[in-house]
Amino acid sequence: FLIIEPAKGEYKKVLGGFEDVRVLGTNPQLMEQLKINPFSFPVGIHVEEHIDRLIDIFNACWPMYAAMPAVLKEAICRAYESCGWDLIQSKSNYEVFPTFDDVIRELNLYINESEYSSDSKGDYKGALGTRLESLTNGIIGQIFAGKPIEDNELFNKNIIIDLSRVGSV
């Protein structure tokens, strides 16, 4: 089973002591820390499909206006390419996935190179950069950094993800 516990931590208290149950959380001082990379995906998924799903998720999470979704998508595509991905063939020589830091770097490069007005450049850098940077700081930043839990482990073992100690971003 996979239980994602957003509030009270009750499942962790009831089931967390069993030998075959792994509890992952946000505070590494209290339990094993959850580590995920939203830019990684399993074999059999095309990188462009994954990028499109990421853009859908970001659109649902953050208010996006004007060209922001297109700018973010371009930054994500460039981040994959800078990690060695061929987006057309959906192959990588290195099997390395980008991180939020990679996307932020590519976002700034892309906006600087673009034909947008200086006001628009500032708006896009400010709006998208701030949102992405919020995912690289504090506990959330720790979750999205480092070696992520393997999909096989996450989806085929008994896992409780305790998010009760983190607020919304």
Language-model segments: residues:
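P-loop NTPase motor domains
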Residues: 2-169
